[in-house]
């Protein structure tokens, strides 16, 4: 039996854990298609331009493990109408209860589509995303970091690194981030950062470090026994290279390059948004 086709619609600008929890809950009802609002629709709805352009929002959402596909809507389209998408016939439109739309509900009724609202309580908590099925014979790759403002640059890094093997991301625990970066860090607590990272379809599993210092992931590395430790050029410090050499782990340094056509992002800059 084919899975149920579910549609959700919105701007999904500056995606946070709450947005991903909504997508996760929607995905439990069937395959999720995101009808993504264009920049003009966000400007009209909020009075301000989106923080991230349509192409970047589309790239980010396409990497979310709870999303089957993303369809950008045309400028001028009715954002509350059931979109006409070739070969796609949804049986369910899902909204958060706080975003209930009588216009959407009426449109769904006209087309025989169920309209369902998810209560806010259903998005409570930050459950650890379950590990993806391991591919036999693939190497284990680990990356580490703070991931305090998860953005398209992180997604691109994960996309590239996951080509080397099954990717495990070890997120720095709160106390260690404060130790390394000072007061005011991290912006987001460790459970939320792990949830954001673990929602990527490129990530086999996201974990929280339990060690200290620049190689705070040592206990997790000892348990996982990865063959590759990957960093970007900014992360090539703190004795990681020597740590890997002493343990026979291949050490790879990747350049910080955004996905084609997208701007370069950094968490430090985004904290000023």
Name each model-derived stretch.
Residues 1-273:
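Nucleotidyltransferase catalytic core that binds NTPs
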């Amino acid at each position: 039996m084919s899975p149920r086709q579910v549609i959700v619609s919105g701007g999904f600008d500056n995606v946070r854990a709450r947005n991903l929890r909504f997508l996760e809950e929607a995905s439990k009802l069937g395959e999720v298609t995101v009808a993504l609002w264009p920049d003009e629709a966000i400007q009209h709805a909020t009075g301000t331009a989106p923080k991230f352009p349509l192409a970047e929002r589309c790239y980010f959402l396409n990497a979310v493990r709870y999303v089957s596909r993303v369809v950008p809507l045309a400028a001028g389209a009715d954002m509350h109408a059931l979109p006409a998408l070739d070969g796609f016939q949804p049986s369910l439109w899902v909204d958060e209860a706080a975003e209930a739309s009588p216009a959407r509900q009426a449109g769904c009724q006209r087309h025989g589509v169920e309209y369902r609202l998810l209560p806010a309580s259903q998005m409570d908590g930050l459950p650890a995303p379950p590990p993806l099925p391991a591919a036999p014979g693939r190497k284990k790759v680990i990356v580490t970091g703070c991931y305090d403002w998860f953005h398209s640059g992180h997604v691109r890094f994960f996309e590239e690194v996951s080509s080397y093997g099954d990717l495990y991301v070890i997120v720095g625990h709160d106390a260690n981030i404060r130790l390394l970066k000072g007061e005011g860090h991290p912006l987001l607590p460790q459970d939320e950062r792990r949830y954001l990272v673990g929602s990527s379809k490129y990530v086999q599993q996201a974990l929280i470090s339990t060690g200290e210092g620049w190689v705070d992931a040592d206990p997790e590395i000892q348990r996982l026994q990865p063959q590759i430790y990957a960093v970007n050029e900014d992360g090539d410090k703190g004795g990681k290279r020597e740590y890997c050499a002493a343990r026979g782990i291949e050490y790879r340094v990747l350049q910080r390059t955004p996905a084609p056509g997208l701007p370069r992002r950094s968490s430090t800059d985004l904290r000023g948004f």
